[in-house]
C-alpha cells in the first residue's frame, strides 16, 4: 500500500512533483504493519485530481492493500459495507425481539383457528387463541436478551455519531450481541425440547425469537470480521463511511421506533396481538397490501393513513441512502480496482517484453482497459443484484412452502407479487411462522426490488446512450451541421470529431512557440538568461523575475542607481517576458473556456488523445524545469497515469490549466512590480547623467 500511496499522491498529467507526499508516510506504513495498528497515510493527492475524482480518496487510502488485488476489494467491502449492514440489522433485531418478549410462545392447537376477516364486520381478525404462559425462566432470559440487544444498538449509534471510540464500541457490541443472541438461542432450543409437548403449537412469538437470535448473531459475526481486519492492519480503527453516510444508523433506528409504535398502536386499535400488529405494519409500510388484516373503525383508518405515509417516506430514504453507499459511492472504487488490475497486467507485460509502445498506442490501450472495466462493472453489478433477488425470491418461497403448506409454485407466485408490491390478497401467510418470516423477508426483499429496477435502468440507459452515439456517427457531418448551427458550432465540432480542441488551436500554439523562440534568441543578445526550447517543442519562458531582480541588484552601483546598459537589457527582457505570459494566458483562457463548457454539458465526456496532448503542451509552457516533467511514451499505462482513476476528465483538465492561469497572473504582477523598480532606477540614472 505504501507504493500505491506514493504514486497516488502524484497523479497528475505526468507532472511528477505537483503533489508531494510527506516523508512520514512510508515510515508510518511500516509501523502500522509492525504494531498492527494502521494509521491513515498522509499522502495527499494534488488538489486538481482530488476535485475531479468520482470518489473520496480517503476511502481508498486507508485500505492497506494493493488496489489491483482481490484482497483490496474484500477489505474495502468489510470496512464500508459491513457497518451499513449492521446498522440495518441491529435495530430490526431489537424491534422483533420486543415481539418475542410480549408474545406468548405456546398455544393450544385446538384453538388455533384463523377466520376469514371478510366474513364478519368486526375488528377482530383472529379468534382469541388460548395461549399458555411461558416458564418464568424463558421470560427472564428474553428480558435480559432484549436489554443487551438494546444496549448494543445504543452503543453502535454512538459510534456512528463519533461519540464513542472504535475499540470501546466494538468490545461492547460484540460482547452484547453475542450474549443476547446466545441466550435467546439457548432459550429457543430448551423451549422446543422440554416445554413444547404435542398439544401445543408454536406461536408467532416463538418464531420471532428464532429470527432475533439469528440477527443478533449475524451482527456479531459481521463486527467480528471488521475487528479482525483492523487487527490485521488492513485499515485504521474506524468505519469507512463518510459523515453523511453515518446518518443511516439514525434513520434505521427511527424506522424501528416507528414500527414499534405502530405495532403497539394497531394492536389496540385492531384487537390483535403485538406480533400480528407488527406483521400488519410491515405489510402497510411496504405497500404490499395483502388484505388479510383490515382496519374497520374510523380511528384505525385515520392512523393507517398517517402511519403509512410517514413510514413509506422513511423507508424510501433508507433505501436511497443504502443504494447510494453501495452503488454510487462505492461503484467508482470498484471501477478503479478493475482498471488498476487491467493496467497492472498490461504494464507488467510491457516491462517484461521488448516491445515499444508509442504514446498514442499506450493511450488507446488505457482507454480500452477503461471501457472493458466499465462494461464488466455494469454486468457484474447486474448479475449480483439479480442473484440476490433470485435468492430472496426462490429461497423465500421455499420457506413459505413449509410454513404455510402451499405448493411451491403458489409460493413463487406469492413471493413475486409481494416483490412487485401488487398484493392481490388471494394468498397471505396465516401461521405464526409464516407471518414472522414475512416481516424480516419483506423488509429486505421489497426494497431490493427498487435497487434492481434502478440498476437495470442505469444499464439500459448506458446501452441506449452507446447506441445513440453509434447511430449519430453514421450520419454525415453535413446533416449534423444543419442540426448544430450558430452558437452550437463548438458542440457540433465535438460531436463530429470527438475532440474539443481544433487543429487551429494547436497550429496557433505552434506558431506562438516559434514566435516566442525567435524573440528569445533576440533577447539573448541582451540577457544571458535566455529561453531554451525543449524536446517537446514547447518554449520555456525567460528566467524567473526573482533572478532578474537579483542580477539587477548586483549590477547596481553603491548608490542603488543602475547603469543605463543594464537598464536597457533588463527592460527588453521584462517586456518579452510579459508578452510571452500574455500570449500563454490567452491560449489558456481559450482552452479553459472550452473545458468549462464541456463540464457543464457532460460530466462523463472523455478527452481524446489530441486533447490531452494539447493540454499537456499548454501546461509545459509555464514550467521552468522541463526535464522534471518529461514523460515517456508509455506514460498512459504507467503507474503515474491519471486515467486509472474514475475521473471527470474535463474538470481535471480545467483545474490543471486554471492553476497555470493563476501562476501566469502572478508572474504578470511580479513583472509590473519589477518594471516599476527598473523605471525608477532608469530615471535616477538619466538624472545623474544630466548632472
UniProtKB/Swiss-Prot annotation:
The chain crosses the membrane at residues 72-92, 138-158, 171-191, 204-224, 247-266, 302-322, 380-400, 436-456. It comes from the Eukaryota. InterPro entries: 2pore_dom_K_chnl, K_chnl_dom. Residues 504-550 are annotated as: Disordered. The modification Phosphoserine is found at residue 119. Keywords: Cell membrane, Ion channel, Ion transport, Membrane, Phosphoprotein, Transmembrane, Transmembrane helix, Transport, Voltage-gated channel. The keyword Transmembrane applies. Residues 504-513 have a biased composition (Acidic residues). Belongs to the two pore domain potassium channel (TC 1.A.1.8) family. This is Outward-rectifier potassium channel TOK1.
Amino acid at each position: 500500500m505504501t507504493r500505491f500511496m506514493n504514486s497516488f499522491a502524484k497523479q497528475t498529467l505526468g507532472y511528477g512533483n505537483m503533489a508531494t507526499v510527506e516523508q512520514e508516510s512510508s515510515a508510518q506504513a511500516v509501523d502500522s504493519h509492525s504494531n498492527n495498528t494502521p494509521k491513515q497515510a498522509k499522502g495527499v493527492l494534488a488538489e486538481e485530481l482530488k476535485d475531479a475524482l468520482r470518489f473520496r480518496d480517503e476511502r481508498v487510502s486507508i485500505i492497506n492493500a494493493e488496489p489491483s488485488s482481490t484482497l483490496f476489494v474484500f477489505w474495502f467491502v468489510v470496512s464500508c459495507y459491513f457497518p451499513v449492514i449492521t446498522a440495518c440489522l441491529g435495530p430490526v433485531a431489537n424491534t422483533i425481539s420486543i415481539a418475542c418478549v410480549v408474545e406468548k410462545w405456546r398455544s393450544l392447537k385446538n384453538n388455533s383457528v384463523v377466520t376469514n376477516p371478510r366474513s364478519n364486520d368486526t375488528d377482530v381478525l383472529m379468534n382469541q387463541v388460548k395461549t399458555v404462559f411461558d416458564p418464568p425462566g424463558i421470560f427472564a432470559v428474553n428480558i435480559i436478551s432484549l436489554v443487551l440487544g438494546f444496549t448494543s444498538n445504543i452503543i453502535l449509534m454512538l459510534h456512528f455519531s463519533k461519540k464513542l471510540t472504535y475499540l470501546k464500541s466494538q468490545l461492547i457490541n460484540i460482547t452484547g450481541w453475542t450474549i443476547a443472541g446466545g441466550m435467546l438461542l439457548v432459550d429457543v432450543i430448551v423451549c422446543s425440547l422440554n416445554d413444547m409437548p404435542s398439544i401445543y403449537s408454536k406461536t408467532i412469538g416463538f418464531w420471532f425469537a428464532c429470527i432475533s437470535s439469528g440477527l443478533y448473531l449475524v451482527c456479531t459475526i459481521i463486527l467480528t470480521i471488521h475487528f479482525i481486519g483492523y487487527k490485521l492492519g488492513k485499515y485504521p480503527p474506524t468505519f469507512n463511511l463518510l459523515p453523511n453516510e453515518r446518518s443511516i444508523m439514525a434513520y434505521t433506528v427511527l424506522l424501528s421506533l416507528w414500527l414499534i409504535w405502530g405495532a403497539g398502536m394497531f394492536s389496540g386499535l385492531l384487537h390483535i396481538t403485538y406480533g400480528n400488529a407488527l406483521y400488519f405494519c410491515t405489510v402497510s409500510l411496504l405497500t404490499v397490501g395483502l388484505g388479510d388484516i383490515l382496519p374497520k373503525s374510523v380511528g384505525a383508518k385515520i392512523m393507517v393513513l398517517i402511519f403509512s405515509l410517514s413510514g413509506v417516506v422513511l423507508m424510501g430514504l433508507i433505501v436511497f441512502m443504502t443504494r447510494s453507499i453501495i452503488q454510487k459511492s462505492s461503484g467508482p472504487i470498484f471501477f478503479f480496482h478493475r482498471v488498476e488490475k487491467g493496467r497492472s497486467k498490461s504494464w507488467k507485460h510491457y516491462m517484461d517484453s521488448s516491445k515499444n509502445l508509442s504514446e498514442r498506442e499506450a493511450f488507446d490501450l488505457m482507454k480500452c482497459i477503461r471501457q472493458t472495466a466499465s462494461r464488466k462493472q455494469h454486468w457484474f453489478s447486474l448479475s449480483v443484484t439479480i442473484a440476490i433477488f433470485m435468492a430472496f425470491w426462490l429461497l423465500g418461497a421455499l420457506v413459505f412452502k413449509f410454513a404455510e403448506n402451499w405448493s411451491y409454485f403458489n409460493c413463487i407466485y406469492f413471493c413475486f407479487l409481494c416483490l412487485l408490491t401488487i398484493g392481490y390478497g388471494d394468498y397471505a401467510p396465516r401461521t405464526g411462522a409464516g407471518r414472522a418470516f414475512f416481516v424480516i423477508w419483506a423488509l429486505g426483499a421489497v426494497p431490493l426490488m427498487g435497487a434492481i429496477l434502478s440498476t437495470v435502468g442505469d444499464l439500459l440507459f448506458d446501452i441506449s446512450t452507446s447506441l445513440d452515439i453509434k447511430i449519430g456517427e453514421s450520419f454525415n457531418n453535413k446533416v449534423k451541421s444543419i442540426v448544430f448551427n450558430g452558437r452550437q458550432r463548438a458542440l457540433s465540432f465535438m460531436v463530429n470529431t470527438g475532440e474539443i480542441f481544433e487543429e487551429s488551436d494547436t497550429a496557433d500554439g505552434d506558431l506562438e512557440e516559434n514566435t516566442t523562440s525567435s524573440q528569445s534568441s533576440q533577447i539573448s543578445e541582451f540577457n544571458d538568461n535566455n529561453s531554451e526550447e525543449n524536446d517537446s517543442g514547447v518554449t520555456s519562458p525567460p528566467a524567473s523575475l526573482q533572478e532578474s531582480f537579483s542580477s539587477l541588484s548586483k549590477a547596481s552601483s553603491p548608490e542603488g542607481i543602475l547603469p543605463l546598459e543594464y537598464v536597457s537589457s533588463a527592460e527588453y527582457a521584462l517586456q518579452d517576458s510579459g508578452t510571452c505570459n500574455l500570449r500563454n494566458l490567452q491560449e489558456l483562457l481559450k482552452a479553459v473556456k472550452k473545458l468549462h463548457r464541456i463540464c457543464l454539458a457532460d460530466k462523463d465526456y472523455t478527452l481524446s488523445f489530441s486533447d490531452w496532448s494539447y493540454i499537456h503542451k499548454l501546461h509545459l509552457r509555464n514550467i521552468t524545469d522541463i526535464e522534471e516533467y518529461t514523460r515517456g511514451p508509455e506514460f498512459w499505462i504507467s503507474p503515474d497515469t491519471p486515467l486509472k482513476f474514475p475521473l471527470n476528465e474535463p474538470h481535471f483538465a480545467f483545474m490543471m490549466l486554471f492553476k497555470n492561469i493563476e501562476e501566469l497572473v502572478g508572474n504578470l504582477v511580479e513583472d509590473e512590480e519589477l518594471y516599476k523598480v527598473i523605471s525608477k532606477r532608469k530615471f535616477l540614472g538619466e538624472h545623474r547623467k544630466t548632472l
